[in-house]
Every structure is written in structure tokens, then in C-alpha cells.
A protein has these predicted regions:
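Short, conserved glycine- and acidic-residue-centered signature motifs
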Residues: 1
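Conserved anion-binding
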Residues: 4, 11-19, 25-104
């Protein structure tokens, strides 16, 4: 829960970067977590659309959030990897994310 995350934040060393790992349903949910925790980075770990990440980038560019945006791209475990598609997806998201994380 968000209340538990706020509590846990008090145990984080001051020199440590705080990353909020989210699978948000809305931009409002991201803002709620950001405003409560003020993380150094927001990791989008779900299947957020390119448009969703663009909206988050716009909020960052407009000074509404001050956190790095990390977008996770999932690789299915039981399927053959199409590296060309994976690379193209990463290139699309890199326009709006500060970092891309590939996860299986």
C-alpha cells in the first residue's frame, strides 16, 4: 500500500536513490505515488502504452514531477525472441523514458 511505502521510505539511507516500481492504471495513480514518496525514479513495470509514457514525460518537462522515468519492456519466457521488434519497441519508448529495462 502507499501508506506502507511512505513508512518504508523512512528507513532508506539518505544517499540511496529511491525507485517507485509501479504497474499503474492511470497517470493520477503515478502522481499520487510521486507526491507521497518523491522518488528519484519511477519504474513503469506494467504494459503502459507509448502514449502513457509520453504523458508522464510531459509532466516531467512541465516540472510536475522530478524523477527519472524507467520503462520496462517485457520479454516472454516461452516464446522465441524477435530482437528486431524488441529493438524497435525500445527505440519508440526511448523518446520519452530516461532508461529502458528489459525483463523476462
Amino acid at each position: 500500500s502507499l501508506d506502507k511505502a511512505v513508512e518504508l521510505k523512512s528507513y532508506v539511507a539518505p544517499f540511496t536513490s529511491l525507485v517507485a516500481v509501479l504497474m499503474p492504471n492511470s497517470i493520477e495513480e503515478v502522481l499520487e505515488v510521486y507526491n507521497a514518496l518523491k522518488p528519484n525514479a519511477i519504474q513503469l513495470h506494467g504494459f503502459e502504452s507509448l502514449e502513457f509514457v509520453k504523458k508522464l514525460r510531459d509532466l516531467k518537462n512541465n516540472g510536475k514531477i522530478d524523477a527519472h522515468i524507467i520503462k520496462v519492456i517485457h520479454i516472454p519466457k516461452d516464446e522465441e525472441i524477435d530482437f528486431k521488434t524488441l529493438l524497435n519497441t525500445a527505440k519508440d519508448y526511448e523518446k520519452y523514458a530516461d532508461a529502458i529495462l528489459v525483463d523476462t
